[in-house]
Amino acid sequence: MSGSHVPSANGPFSALTPSMWPQEILAKYAQEEATVEQPEFRYDEFGFRVDKEDADGIPYSGQLLEDPPQRLRWQAHLEFTHNHDVGDLTWDKIAVSLPRSEKLRSLVLAGVPHSMRPQLWMRLSGALQKKRNSELSYREIVKNSSNDETIAAKQIEKDLLRTMPSNACFAHVSGVGVPRLRRVLRALAWLYPEIGYCQGTGMVAACLLLFLEEDDAFWMMCAIIEDLLPASYFSTTLLGVQTDQRVLRHLIVQYLPRLDRLLQEHDIELSLITLHWFLTAFASVVHIRLLLRLWDLFFYEGSLVLFQATLGMLRLKEDELIQSENSASIFNTLSDIPSQLEDADLLLAEAMRLAGSLTAVAVETQRRKHLAYLLADQGQLLGAPATTGLSQVVRRRTQRRKSGITSLLFGEDDLEAMKAKNIKQTELVADLREAILRVARHFQCTDPKNCNVELTPDYSMESHQRDHESYVACSRGHPRRAKALLDFERHDDDELGFRKNDIITIVSQKDEHCWVGELNGLRGWFPAKFVEVLDERSKEYSIAGDDAVTEGVTDLVRGTLCPALKALLEHGLKKPSLLGGACHPWLFIEEAAGREVERDFDSVYSRLVLCKTYRLDEDGKVLTPEELLYRAVQSVNVTHDAAHAQMDVKLRSLICVGLNEQVLHLWLEVLCSSLPTVEKWYQPWSFLRSPGWVQIKCELRVLCCFAFSLSQDWELPAKREEEKKPLKEGVQDMLVKHHLFSWDIDG
């Protein structure tokens, strides 16, 4: 740079991109060196002001910003993977995106050489690809936004000098970074009208401008908004970052249980502190040297790093937090954590040790779930716009097109359906609610003990937290009971007589053929094959829900409830154009159930955890809602395929199993949490891909208050004739064994 002042090596402003060097201040430095006068302020290599008395105590003082051996390792990697021609390797020969590999990740984790950050950040984040593919150049976007006098533009002007007041580049109106920051923020507000301006974007953009040229910083911001962070992160509602705070709280329960108990005990709302960390991606929260290391990884792996780094920070200070005496001390310690961290290697090592196994899929699943809970808590389910989800940020004048293969297989989106989706969704929910109420009224009319059941759905956040607790807390203290399948006449005093459908309390099952039971104050033995053990692990048997006793419940469930639920599952189901018809929800359920249960197959640890978590079946096998769904689907397939039953029949039978197990609402949550499967089978405007599924879950939860005993095979034709045959088989051997010849077997 001819005629300009250049910072000294490792001196003030030396880490900035050359176009950001503040020439006036550098000129004063040059004059002061000649006159041996002390300057008014001292600045570090990043341009941040340092008080004179603290100049010798600056964190990281004396440390080199770039490690020469690390730079050589990066050069060797780039040479090996990109230089296929003889000659020197230059940046224009390196692809716009770097192929992902464990080697590249290890290099990123160890740190990007500072002199390479502008070029590598653009490639790691996908910003360079975005810049090359854009129909509008940054210059054109700036031109379009320069005359855009909006509320956002006025707010940007107010915040320009507030964004980074301690940095020489942004401290004054004449600062070299101020006009750049203005143009970048106005361009972003113009390009993303649904976002406009958010103070979080200003903080991130200002930090990027310290190290990248203006247009590159803009495209980096586009990559952050569109790809690295979920949508609605910087919207006026801050819905995305609020959702991530709930996800973080869930992860703390999993990874830092001691800290979780402490926060609960002192009723501390962690999001009051950490929301700002996430909103600015740690910009202005941690020291700039530490920020650079975090951003190296953030631009490579995305928002997953925000969770890992936060968990790592909390873990490093966990012992100190546990020893805190009161809530105020805990809150202050939490607030001070970022400013007290200096060692990037220590933080990243702890973050990877603690949460290195955390995956983007797991985070996205939790995001979808907690977003739905958040919207349900705010009462924004019905009629919510399609953009409520966190799937995509919409640019001005741009629309993402489908690939040719996707369009050919599943057709184009039905625009009319998207326009009318709110009306359709309301009708579907109303039909389901009416079907549920009809079933509930049947129980209350048939069995008076159900009259006090609350039929109004609970939409609160706490209700979702209680779902799994209720599922786990099965009642085991009461005696087992059985339902009589046939009349059994009492001949001797030690026999227990009963009529068909009587409910018998089982006293002893020591003998496999003869059990001892009680009925109406009498105790005696009876043939075990003449009764059916009731599943009352989490419910008390009711004749109103037994289709063998009360046939009316079959019509209500299979004839009214199942069609209403099927209509919801069919809403937005993609229609394959090549096959000429809609896919059936049963196919989606099969795939989703298989995908969800596969996650446990390869993990011994997960099965050990499950043993402490969920209820057991009769054999002591652990059954999570996912495993229960998978088993039910397989069971229905085995029995129904043999009878050549249609998928409609299978779906109705599966719903009956879910009602029996009181998990129909949890199964819906399992299905909707299988993001890849849902996105494959359903349109973006469908119920299952919108937060509206949480309302359906709340409606279905009402049904778990009632005890169903529905036959899975009720619609199978051969079942009716076979039911009576096996009941008396083996009874004669049992009577011989117990010398009870007085009973007429053939009677």
Swiss-Prot record:
Molecular functions per Gene Ontology: GTPase activator activity; small GTPase binding
Which residue numbers delimit the RUN domain? 552-715
Q: Name one GO biological process term.
A: positive regulation of protein catabolic process
The keyword Phosphoprotein is annotated on this UniProt entry: yes
Q: Which Pfam families match?
A: RabGAP-TBC (PF00566), RUN (PF02759), SH3_1 (PF00018)
- Top-level taxon of origin: Eukaryota
Cell location: Cytoplasm
Q: Which residues form the signal peptide?
A: none
Outline the extent of the SH3 domain.
477-536
Question: Where is it predominantly found?
Answer: cytoplasm
Instruction: Report the residue ranges that make up the Rab-GAP TBC domain in this protein.
Output: 111-302
Residue positions, PTM Phosphoserine: 403
Q: Which GO terms describe its cellular component?
A: cytosol; gap junction
Q: Which UniProt keywords apply?
A: Cell cycle, Coiled coil, Cytoplasm, Growth arrest, Phosphoprotein, SH3 domain
- Annotated coiled-coil positions are 412-435
Task: Tell me the function of this protein.
Answer: May play a cooperative role in NF2-mediated growth suppression of cells.
Query: What does the sequence similarity comment in the record state about its family?
Result: Belongs to the small G protein signaling modulator family.
Quaternary structure per UniProt? Interacts with GJA1. Interaction with GJA1 induces its degradation. Interacts via its RUN domain with the C-terminal region of NF2. Interacts with RAB3A, RAB4A, RAB5A, RAB8A, RAB11A, RAP1A, RAP1B, RAP2A, RAP2B and PDCD6I. No interaction with RAB27A.
Protein name per its UniProtKB record: Small G protein signaling modulator 3
Organism name: Bos taurus
